[in-house]
A protein has these predicted regions:
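Alpha-helical transmembrane segments of multi-pass membrane proteins predominantly involved
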Residues: 1-506
């Protein structure tokens, strides 16, 4: 093979394997688990989850080591400029690894309860994580698309993984069809950007735009390409008006999968959006920033209002996630202002980490309350939870008040950060809308808390299946609650770390 390459005068890129180690560990863990599980007897109880957790922790630890290296040596590109090694990529990698660990712990008992034991779901978590990491670290739009498709295909299968539930199959099919359209828009956007600038490399695109060497008429095609890129990314983050898939998919998918989708999937898509807009298209900020503004306002307003009128908790949380997407878009909009990239980028990245932990903790409790069949997701299922499982109700209360933005929780720090970033760039209108949206959404969380703490069980409720709290899910929920409170009270270290995220490889 080496002689053939030499004869063809093909120059292979130098590869820094250690820089790729988090991705390689995730891939290796998924492949090894599938191969070994296929060649041996069924593994002991909980082993699939344990292997997944170990793999994700190892990848996260390697990302932390690389963080120190990048802090000392500065950001750079790797694999011939197709991937970026910077704090944004490593922050996203760590966020996704945290999501894998928590989701795997919540999933372990769920799969056994639903008679779905097997390594497939865990392997799909890992493959989705690989796609997400590649997507957010990509320094080339084609590589971004490859990561996007790897992430998306894994999530499509995960959404439909509960084959005995028609709702799960329907949600996976719907997500696949609509996601295919979004991917097509994104790919066509890449084609238009390439046709205009002559490159798909993010750094090269930025160089061409900064040099202002576009031919007459090319600016229209370029703006069309940027618009199509935003359509594809807005679909993945479930921003209004590209949110229509989220409520049905969140409701129909297995609850732990919904948690992973809302955390890791959203983090990857948002960080990829930040990289594309801030690195490749800063010279077009005056063109894309108003679009982000409209998406943010629409998501904040519609997400909060529609969440309040729902009676199914998973649909409530789906619309709530749309509202949270609006908050993150507030940070993205702030990052589009000249000279203030750091504030918006750092606040968005911090929000994504805090939200990932919050949403998995919330869905972890929902997973336990819905019981066998994953169908009891009406708000009435939470009646009297405080009297039956007071610690579980307390944990859910922590997550809900954090999502509402109550002080001394990580949710308050996250929301305060993006609103402060908007105020700093004088986007006062969107900051006010965000604060009003937070007040409206608080009513949603209050409804669930009232059902848990102030509403007693009704006749017939005593016959329902009791709520079990298995060890693995209990650890995940307790860890998420502790994280929410500790970094809500002492956020300084993470805030300082997030401020380094804006130093992007170019």
């Amino acid at each position: 093979m080496a002689s053939l390459v030499a004869q063809a005068n093909v120059e292979l890129p130098e590869i820094d394997w250690f820089a790729l180690s988090p991705v390689l560990v995730l891939i290796g863990t998924a492949v090894a688990m599938l191969v070994v599980a296929g060649l041996t007897r069924p593994w002991a109880r909980g082993m699939y989850a344990l292997v997944t957790v170990v793999g994700a922790c190892t990848a996260g630890a390697l990302a932390m080591v690389l963080w120190v290296e990048v802090s000392n040596d500065g950001p750079r590109t790797i694999v011939n400029g197709s991937l970026a090694l910077d704090h944004l990529a490593l922050w996203g990698t760590i966020t996704i690894c945290v999501a894998i660990v928590l989701a795997a712990l919540v999933t372990e008992d769920y799969l056994r309860r639903e008679s779905m034991d097997g390594p497939e779901v865990y392997a799909l978590y890992l493959s989705a994580a690989v796609g997400g990491v590649v997507m957010l670290a990509a320094n080339d739009l084609v590589v971004t698309f490859l990561g996007l498709e790897t992430l998306s295909l894994s999530l499509y299968v995960l959404a439909s993984s509960h084959r005995r539930r028609a709702e799960s199959t329907e949600s996976g099919f719907k997500y696949f069809i609509l996601g295919g359209f979004a991917s097509a828009f994104f790919l066509y956007g890449i084609a238009l950007v390439y046709g205009t600038t002559g490159s798909t490399n993010i750094s090269d695109v930025a160089g061409v735009l900064d040099a202002e060497v576009l031919l007459q008429g090319d600016d229209v095609m370029l703006l069309a390409g940027v618009g199509l890129l935003l359509v594809g990314l807005a679909f993945k983050v479930a921003a209004v008006p590209f949110h229509f898939w989220a409520p049905d998919v969140y409701q129909g998918a297995p609850t732990p999968v919904t948690a992973f989708m809302a955390s890791a999937g959203k983090a990857a898509a948002f960080l990829a959006m930040l990289r594309v807009l801030v690195v490749a298209l800063p010279s077009l900020a005056d063109d894309w920033r108003p679009v982000i503004w409209v998406l943010a306002v629409a998501s904040l307003v519609l997400g909060s209002i529609l969440a309040v009128v729902q009676t199914d908790v998973k649909r409530m949380l789906a619309y709530s996630s749309i509202s949270h997407a609006g908050f993150i878009l507030v940070g993205v909009e702030a990052a589009g202002h000249v000279g203030r990239v750091n504030d918006g980028t750092a606040s968005s990245a911090l929000y994504l980490l805090f939200y990932a932990v919050l949403v998995i903790g919330t869905f972890g409790v929902v997973t336990l309350v819905t019981r066998t069949g994953d169908g009891a997701t009406d708000i009435g299922a939470f009646r009297g939870l405080a009297s039956e499982r007071p610690l579980l109700a307390l944990g859910l209360t922590v997550f809900l008040v954090a999502q509402a933005g109550v002080p001394l929780t990580s949710g308050f720090i996250a929301k305060f950060g993006v609103i402060e970033a908007a105020v700093d760039v004088e986007s006062y209108a969107i900051a006010i809308i965000a604060m009003v949206s937070a007040v409206v959404a608080a009513y949603l969380y209050l409804r669930i808390m009232v059902s848990m703490w102030l509403t007693g069980t009704e006749e017939g409720d005593t016959e329902r299946e009791p709520v079990r709290v298995p060890l693995s899910a209990g650890i995940a929920i307790a860890a998420a609650a502790a994280f929410t409170l500790v970094f809500g009270i002492f956020p300084g270290w993470l805030i300082e770390a997030s401020e380094q995220v804006a130093a992007l490889a170019r």
